[in-house]
């Protein structure tokens, strides 16, 4: 147990850290929270993960030293993320009740995402507890890079994030792109800003899983003899799976055949998936696109390991944890340079960063790599080495230093 720090609460109001990434509002943030909590617990700090109950509240232990606590706020049903601000005060009151006003059970509160901060900051102020804020995504970043069909983030979120930046005892960012936005757009004070990149589970995501190639392909209904391009994440305009379909069509046009594009994740809006299917049909590659849904972590790790390349076509990424997971699996990543992927993809080492959003430019990279097996193998090996430099133990140690500094002061 560390000096002065026994138990902390991480708050994720809008999505449970235990939810499956790629489904609903779950993504890299969920993975990061749970992994950090487990790594902190391994260092002797008990961690409670607090989330809103979207069904009957049930508390459970997720790992040794890590417990999930679901708190009632609003009806016990899913509420669209855009309307959760209406129950933020009620959720905050539930947090205060759990923490205990007379003798707080936690040494520190760490809010993840702006809604959690909005609900939790008043509790921290009332009880005199140190307050840490992680945003994971920022409205200003998203609004600068909207995809076709995307809805701009509301003014209320912009104001809320700006307010939290002025009030938090510490702000933890995951990438240089996030830091730039925090300082330039939200006027964050650099002396309260910490940059802690996420880690990756290199035991789970490993090239060793490639030996399961046939079983993985059969399980997912994929042909045994075709190269695979993978996209993993929620199916939504922000992630721009449409660009991936257009890249596939461009590869087909230049080579006369196409690899399989495997899209792992669920649609935030069915109309967008319908649009993707129409575009694939119009471009003549409908038989080359597979939607496999949101995958559990083991199956996703298998898919990355047997794939040739991973595509990350998002308009906006704060960091892009998927890039590390793919790299750890020995699979290079092609990503858009104009995002936080500049921190998660090492150009020429773990993948290739593309400067444009032109499908022709992306397809040229895909064709070049698929047509040069030795180069692809070298890039896969160096990608694994790059990913090994990002560990959850290191991230947790850095985060613990932030916590201990606040508790001591």
Regions found by a protein language model. Give the residues of each.
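Aromatic "clamp/platform" in nucleotide-sugar-dependent glycosyltransferases that forms part
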Residues: 315
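Nucleotide-activated donor-binding/catalytic signature segment of Leloir-type glycosyltransferases, i.e.
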Residues: 273-295
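Glycosyltransferase donor-sugar binding loop
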Residues: 260-278
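Short alpha-helical donor nucleotide-sugar binding micro-motif in glycosyltransferases
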Residues: 294, 302-307
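N-terminal subdomain of nucleotide-sugar transferases
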Residues: 1-66, 70
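Short hydrophobic beta-strand element within catalytic cores of glycosyltransferases
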Residues: 332-335
């Amino acid at each position: 147990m560390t000096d002065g720090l026994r138990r902390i609460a991480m708050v994720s109001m809008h999505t449970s850290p235990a939810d499956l990434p790629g489904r609903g509002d779950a993504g890299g943030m969920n993975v990061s929270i749970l992994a950090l909590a487990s790594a902190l617990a391994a260092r002797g700090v008990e961690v409670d993960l607090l989330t809103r109950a979207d069904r009957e509240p049930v508390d459970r232990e997720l790992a040794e030293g890590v417990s999930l606590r679901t708190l009632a706020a609003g009806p016990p049903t899913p509420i669209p993320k855009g309307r959760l601000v209406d129950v933020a005060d009620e959720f905050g009151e539930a947090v205060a009740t759990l923490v205990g006003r007379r003798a707080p059970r936690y040494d520190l509160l760490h809010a993840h995402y702006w809604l959690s901060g909005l609900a939790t900051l008043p509790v921290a102020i009332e009880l005199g507890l140190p307050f840490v804020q992680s945003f994971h995504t920022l409205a200003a970043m998203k609004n600068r890079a909207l995809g076709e069909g995307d809805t701009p983030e509301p003014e209320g979120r912009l104001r809320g994030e700006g307010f939290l930046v002025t009030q938090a005892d510490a702000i933890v960012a995951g990438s240089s792109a996030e830091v730039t936005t925090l300082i330039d757009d939200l006027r964050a004070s650099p002396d309260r800003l910490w940059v802690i990149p996420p880690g990756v589970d290199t035991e789970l995501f490993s090239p060793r899983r490639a030996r399961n190639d046939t079983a993985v392909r059969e399980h997912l209904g994929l042909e045994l003899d075709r190269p695979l391009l993978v996209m993993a994440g929620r199916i939504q305009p922000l992630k721009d799976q449409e660009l991936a379909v257009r890249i596939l069509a461009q590869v087909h046009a230049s080579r006369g055949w196409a690899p399989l594009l495997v899209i792992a994740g669920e649609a935030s809006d069915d109309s967008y998936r319908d649009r993707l299917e129409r575009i694939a049909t119009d471009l003549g590659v409908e038989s080359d696109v597979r939607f496999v849904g949101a995958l559990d972590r083991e199956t996703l790790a298998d898919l990355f390991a047997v794939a040739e390349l991973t595509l990350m076509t998002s308009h906006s990424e704060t960091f892009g944890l998927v890039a590390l997971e793919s790299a750890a699996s020995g699979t290079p990543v092609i990503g858009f340079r104009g995002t936080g992927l500049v921190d998660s993809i090492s150009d020429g080492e773990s993948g290739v960063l593309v400067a444009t959003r032109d499908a022709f430019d992306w397809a040229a990279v895909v064709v070049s790599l698929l047509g040069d097996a030795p180069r692809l193998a070298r890039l896969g090996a160096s990608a694994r080495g790059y990913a090994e430099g990002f560990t959850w133990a290191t991230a947790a140690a850095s985060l613990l230093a932030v916590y201990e500094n606040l508790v001591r002061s």
